[in-house]
């Protein structure tokens, strides 16, 4: 819990902001124990899909959107991608097989990768690091 936030915060400057959306209060509590004193972090407790629907209605757009869970990656991806500024990044992880994946999930991952590589207005690159990353850059 919090590895993604640690990675992102390490590369951010003092004027940047990280919005962390977490559905489970216990998981957010663990992450907050580590990062709560960092003024760059905004904590949102709630459903990722609901947050995405609310966020696209606001004018703010982001330099980087890191889709680390089902909302924004396997559903409501169009909403998450809409939040990315021109020339910004949309980052997907966990694209290599993982222990505990439900049966048939590899087909979801394969479809996701193929879909991302065919979207107009985006350049994509698969990065064979860690759990398997895809970097998508908006034109």
Give the location of each predicted region.
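S-adenosylmethionine/decaboxylated-SAM
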Residues: 1-139
């Amino acid at each position: 819990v919090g590895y993604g936030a640690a990675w992102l915060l390490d590369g951010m400057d003092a004027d940047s902001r990280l919005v962390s959306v977490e559905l489970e209060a216990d998981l957010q509590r663990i992450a907050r124990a580590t990062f709560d004193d960092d003024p760059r972090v905004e904590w949102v407790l709630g459903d990722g899909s609901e947050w995405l629907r609310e966020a696209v209605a606001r004018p703010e757009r982001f330099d980087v959107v890191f889709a680390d869970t089902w909302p924004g990656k396997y559903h409501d991806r169009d909403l998450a991608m809409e939040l990315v500024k021109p020339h910004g990044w949309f980052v997907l992880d966990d694209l290599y097989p993982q222990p505990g994946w439900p049966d048939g999930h590899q087909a979801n991952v394969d479809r996701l990768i193929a879909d991302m590589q065919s979207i107009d207005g985006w350049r994509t690159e698969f990065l064979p690091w860690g759990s398997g990353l895809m970097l998508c850059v908006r034109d």
